[in-house]
């Protein structure tokens, strides 16, 4: 009988230890996506700078009384990290995209229904000089470690009469070194 009792106790103990996993409920699953790039350049583009959104906000139509009038500037930056200045000394940034029909060195706002007309978007470097779209560039001397390129963006009137609407746009940037 003692042998039988030991077998029963062992069986009940084994059942108790494994029953938690039998009755465990799944709490869900998901996906982990890894992205990145291996580069051979003097600096690495900061993750914070790779995909940005600059909110120009709502601007009163009355700000644009004449061609060339600008909305308040909104800052943004492109941050470079792990910079090695032994081979290259300067970073250049250029912007490419759809140019405004009336002033091609400005970015065209979307032409979708409900879009504003008579304005483009200008990007200006740290010295408040327009970085012409599709050809201009901003340059900065590299610093060992981190280098930051500072910019501002604003709406610029391209026509004497501006119509209200959305002022959305997208532009790509390219880094080069010398």
Curated annotation (Swiss-Prot):
Signal sequence range: 1-24
Chief location bin: other
GO CC, one annotated term: pilus
Aminoacyl-tRNA synthetase keyword on record: no
Gene Ontology process terms (BP): cell adhesion involved in single-species biofilm formation
Pfam families associated with the record: Fimbrial (PF00419)
Alphabetical keyword list: Fimbrium, Signal
Cysteines joined through disulfide linkages: none
Subcellular location: Fimbrium
InterPro entries tied to this protein: Adhesion_dom_fimbrial, Adhesion_dom_fimbrial_sf, Adhesion_dom_sf, Bact_Fimbrial_Adh_Pro
Family per record: Belongs to the fimbrial protein family.
Name of the protein described by the UniProt record: Probable major fimbrial subunit LpfA
Species for this entry: Escherichia coli O157:H7
